Structure formats: structure tokens, C-alpha cells
């Protein structure tokens, strides 16, 4: 075993670097959160809500992705119910995403929607079943077309950018936005919502 001696100052800097960086990707991830025993815990994520003012074309793209996500969710939920009734099994999110890829061959209009949002809809079906089996909620139900409010989540954080009074979202490009000041940080995902009154919002998770 090789022993390395270093000055106290260099040792402190090495410890801080280990705490504030991702050792696998060598990325700066910010301070970690520690519990009462001084042990590192999961980082706390926070969502920031923005009011969106999309153009007519951007509204059409948002509405199309909302419709596609609802269709995928209902289709996968229907498959889950049939598989569980026949064999007592259920599909994983990965299995549903493979089915989704095949669906795009005979349902080409799915290709015009946000692909990450469609995959996330499959994850939502899996999560709904997990919560049901853990008795945390009721049995999953189908989403209605005429729901008062609708939303979808895009998970490609590297394609989401925020500047003064505008936000860039996958498939939509730059959209005029209003809201509170959002600090710099790593963006995980964004949830785009259409309210019952026809207003559009984006919830940015960091």
C-alpha cells in the first residue's frame, strides 16, 4: 500500500473536491446534504415554476405531445391490465419503451412528439402500478381526453436552458417566459402543463 503525505491545506482541498464533485464523471455538482450524523444523503431537488407564452406553432406542438403522452399512457396501461389478468405479470418501463419504439413504425404521428416525454409516460405507468401494489394509492386509471388540466415531462435536462424572460425546451425551442429568478444549477427535467383555462406553465426541476 502506497502512503501519500500532503500538507493540511492540500488535504482540505482534496476533501472539498471529493465532496463537491462527481468522481465518475469529474463534474462539479455542488454541495451535498448531510444528516445529523454527518453522513451524506440525497441532494434536495427544487422545482421552479414559470408562466409560458408560446406562439401558435409552439402551442400546437405542446398540445400534440400532450395528446401523444395520454395515448401512450392509456395504451400501456391497457396492455398492463391484460397481461396481469392473463399471466399475473406486468411489464417494466424498459419493456414498454421497446413496445413504444415498434409503435412508431405504424403510428408515425408519435414521432412528431417529444420522444423523452413519451418514454416518461411509460415510466409513469410502471410507477402507478408500483404504488398500487405497495398500497400507496388506488388502481391506475385511464387519462381522459377532456381532462381539465394536462401535463408531460421531458427528461433531457441538457437541452433545457434558461435565460432572462425565456426558456428553451426540447422540440419547442425558445419560449417567452415569466416567473421568479432561477439560480444557476444542473437542470434535471421540466414538466410542461396546460391549465384548465388554457394557460401554459413549465416546472423546472434542479
Predicted segment positions?
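Nucleic-acid substrate recognition interfaces
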Residues: 2-206
Amino acid at each position: 500500500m502506497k502512503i501519500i503525505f500532503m500538507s493540511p491545506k492540500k488535504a482540505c482541498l482534496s476533501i472539498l473536491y471529493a465532496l463537491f464533485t462527481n468522481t465518475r464523471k469529474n463534474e462539479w455538482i455542488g454541495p451535498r446534504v448531510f444528516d445529523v450524523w454527518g453522513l451524506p444523503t440525497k441532494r434536495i431537488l427544487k422545482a421552479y415554476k414559470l408562466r409560458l407564452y408560446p406562439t401558435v406553432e409552439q402551442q400546437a406542438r405542446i398540445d400534440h405531445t400532450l395528446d401523444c403522452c395520454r395515448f401512450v399512457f392509456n395504451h400501456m396501461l391497457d396492455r398492463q391490465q391484460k397481461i396481469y389478468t392473463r399471466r399475473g405479470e406486468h411489464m417494466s418501463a424498459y419493456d414498454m419503451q421497446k413496445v413504444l419504439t415498434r409503435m412508431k413504425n405504424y403510428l408515425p404521428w408519435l414521432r412528431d412528439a417529444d420522444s423523452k416525454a413519451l418514454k416518461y409516460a411509460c415510466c409513469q405507468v410502471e410507477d402507478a402500478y408500483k404504488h398500487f401494489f405497495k398500497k400507496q394509492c388506488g388502481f391506475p386509471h385511464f387519462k381522459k381526453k377532456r381532462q381539465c388540466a394536462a401535463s408531460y415531462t421531458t427528461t433531457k435536462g441538457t437541452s433545457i436552458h434558461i435565460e432572462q424572460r425565456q426558456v428553451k425546451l426540447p422540440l419547442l425551442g425558445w419560449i417567452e417566459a415569466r416567473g421568479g429568478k432561477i439560480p444557476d444549477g444542473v437542470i434535471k427535467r421540466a414538466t410542461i402543463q396546460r391549465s384548465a383555462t388554457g394557460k401554459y406553465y413549465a416546472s423546472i426541476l434542479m
